[in-house]
Amino acid sequence: MESTMSSASTNASPPSASEKHTPMMQQYLRIKAEHPETLLFYRMGDFYEVFFEDAEKASRLLGITLTQRGSSNGNPIKMAGVPFHAVDQYLSKLVKLGESIALCEQIGDPATSKGPVERKVLRVITPGTLSDSDLLPEKSEQPLLALYSTTQRKTITIGLAWLSMASGALKLMEFTTDARNAATRLKHELERIAPAEVLLPGSIDGPDSDYAFAKNTTVPDWHFDIAHGSKALHEQLKVSTLTGFGAEHLNAAIGAAGALLRYAQATQGKGLQHVRALTVETENEFIGLDAATRRNLELTETIRGQDNNSATLFSLLDHCRTAMGSRLLRHWLHHARRDQAVARARHAAINALMRTDACTGLASTLASVPDVERIATRIALQSARPRDLAGMRGGLQQLPSLRAYVSMCNQDADAPLLKTIHDALATPSECLDLVERAIALEPAAMVRDGGVIARGFDAELDELRGLSENAGQFLVDLETRERTRTGINNLRVEYNKVHGFYIEVTHGQTDKVPDDYRRRQTLKNAERYITPELKAFEDKALSAQERALAREKYLYDQVLQQMAQHIGTLQNIAHALAQLDTLVALAEHALRHNWCAPQLIAEPTIAIEQGRHPVVENHIERFIANDCLLNNESRLLLITGPNMGGKSTYMRQVALITLLAYVGSFVPATSATIGPIDRIFTRIGAADDLAGGRSTFMVEMTESAAILNGATENSLVLMDEVGRGTSTFDGLALAWAIARHLIDSTRSFTLFATHYFELTQLPEVHPSAANVHLSAVEHKDSIVFLHAVQAGPASQSYGLQVAQLAGVPQAVIRAARKHLATLEANSMQATPQFDLFADPDHLIPTSDVETAMAQPSALDEALADINPDALSPRDALDALYRLKELSNQHREK
């Protein structure tokens, strides 16, 4: 029996004199020293134990009991533990908290071990190296990324390598920049890739804010050696050159890949058989979307952050039946390709799917398909469980039906993408035959429980199972014979796990027991015996059961190894299934909501007829559709109108329709014609960055600067209320200058919403700008928003009416109306502010001052205080007499 007890005092960390510890604690401390930065889960029988500082940390994070056992240097050895069969739920919680865990397993036999059972860390679990379905989010990836940079003179080359352990997708990217732009450029790529864990050279001092959102892990600088990285890639991909991947000259990225592969292999404790291909991404491959744009357009998260109950573009479109399809849809939304041919191929496939009734059959069949992609990865890593293989079997059995449906859709249709998918869904007969013969129809959850290998697959296993399963009949026969032989009618032959097989006789009948009965256990009312015959059968039956489990484990491992030979085929099938599922989901949505196929052209234009916001239209009864036209003659639309009139919704819908067109989806419009787009920028909303020490206006200007420095003539820019975070004249001057820069210098397609009515004069001096407004109708003191975009500027903002709708007290509204009248009367007076944008002081006419300073009379105030809708007949009569009295007093003055 192993013990944590220490016969001599020790420290809580490895001491210089290890002999002061028990042999087991010496083993623990040695293994812990090899994994100092991880929580070491140390297997002891049916529990994983943690000790010392790890125990304190685990107790705090997991809410498990912290106890103590033995002592070290006069201090108790702190410990905590979790049951091995429930460890996944604890691992999941720790990983979500950004922790890494080393699983130290018993690999020796406790029955034959002299001293501590041999143990070894078989796997290290980190946020970026997960493959278990219980630890991963179903609909998103959690990639591991390595970053390496080199500097030559003033040029910085940044290499990125990232791996999705759960899918086996390995990607590289490299770009050059200068010191001033390096941080911004890197941040943009990290926001796009969204790694769960970032590997950094140890020479980097502390976490950089650009990648602090992920778990940062430092590894020795020499892990990033370029020569080693090149060799590692050649060995992993089984190639003699990287030229075919376009990666031969990406030295910084190759160095990052070397560190990445070394780390990933170390955490898994084995090779990465499922990493079989390499993709090189380039700077200009995707439509650029920074974090602000992804957030403002609410692609996969709402503006308020992660909220599973709120509507996003992803949640709207995710009709996918498989987790693979959902992950691919999410990827498409964040990685819209600039290449119009890619989107056109998807448009053609969706159109073909919509032309037949096959969508319903495809959807129902896909619903029976498991996560083939992640199961294939676990097969390659030899960590797949029996029910994974049963799921794979069920998924592969659906391939003929899916191919038939795809063929039906592709008849008389020009959809090459569907043809590619059809060909990839060919059934791997050898692989399917193996799993159908080998795995039971309803296997146990774990191999150790038995009942995993199907009957008839292995003769030796069937024989061993027969010995174990026939035990019941043998015991019945033995019980009958012994009752006859002894004359004891209530004699019973039974079995339990503690004492094995036995014959039970009540105390009143023990005098009839034959001489060959040997007492095994005494109970209060009975005696339990064993006979030579029963003992011989026990040895044979129990041995058969143990040997059957061992044989089953051996056979299962053999099946996994044979299945691993088909990983490449299974990965191709998984990718085809994901594409098909995503296209079917988009086709279903387009059919249900009357979306149209967009036209992608080479000329610069965004021409949308009767466009609608895809998410908003799904949540209101009637949505007002609007047009949008941007081209060489009209580069900027200046949008005015009331608060809540729909300006932001209109701007977002134009951006979403544009993005969806390049994603390859149909779009919510009557028609949409869109030219080349390289980036989409948004400057929407107002929020400060308290943690970063930035005010609302600083955030606004930082985002505006990123747009002005990064936008091109092929960019779509959304600017909402620029300049509102500072004084009126400062804000107006900045808004005017920014709008002019976007027209004159960048020539981006721009939607510019503002409440500065002075900006509506911009089209008079810039013909490529045009005024549009969101219309509204005022009725008495209320307002009705029409949400229709019309030509020309708005007449007013209706701010007080909106405040009234929001429930601002009537007294405040009345006071605001009075002050508004004063401000409007004083609108020609120059504001005494002094800054870079202020005009010289102007003389203020005395008459204007007198007008502005005039105070309303008591009669005016009394009249303004009256709310006719709130007066009873008697109150109205009293008010009328009061007004009459004030009027007479005013005339007397």
Swiss-Prot record:
Q: Which segments carry the region annotation Disordered?
A: 1-22
- Is Metal-binding included in the keywords of this UniProt record? no
A GO MF term: ATP binding
In the record, biological process GO terms are: mismatch repair
Gene Ontology CC, one term: cytosol
Cite the record's Low complexity compositional bias ranges.
1-17
Family matches, as InterPro entries: DNA_mismatch_repair_MutS, DNA_mismatch_repair_MutS-lik_N, DNA_mismatch_repair_MutS/MSH, DNA_mismatch_repair_MutS_C, DNA_mismatch_repair_MutS_clamp, DNA_mismatch_repair_MutS_core, DNA_mismatch_repair_MutS_N, DNA_mismatch_repair_MutS_sf
Binding-site residues for ATP, renumbered to this chain: 641-648
**Gene3D superfamilies linked:** 1.10.1420.10, 6.10.140.430, DNA repair protein MutS, domain I (3.40.1170.10), MutS, connector domain (3.30.420.110), P-loop containing nucleotide triphosphate hydrolases (3.40.50.300)
Lyase among the record's keywords?
A: no
Origin superkingdom: Bacteria
Q: Which UniProt keywords are present, listed alphabetically?
A: ATP-binding, DNA damage, DNA repair, DNA-binding, Nucleotide-binding
SMART domains to which the protein is assigned, alphabetical: MUTSac (SM00534), MUTSd (SM00533)
Q: Which NCBIfam families match?
A: mutS1, PRK05399.1
Q: What does this protein do?
A: This protein is involved in the repair of mismatches in DNA. It is possible that it carries out the mismatch recognition step. This protein has a weak ATPase activity.
Q: Which family is this sequence assigned to? A: Belongs to the DNA mismatch repair MutS family.
Q: What is this protein called?
A: DNA mismatch repair protein MutS
- UniProt source species: Herminiimonas arsenicoxydans
Q: What is the lineage of its organism?
A: Bacteria, Pseudomonadati, Pseudomonadota, Betaproteobacteria, Burkholderiales
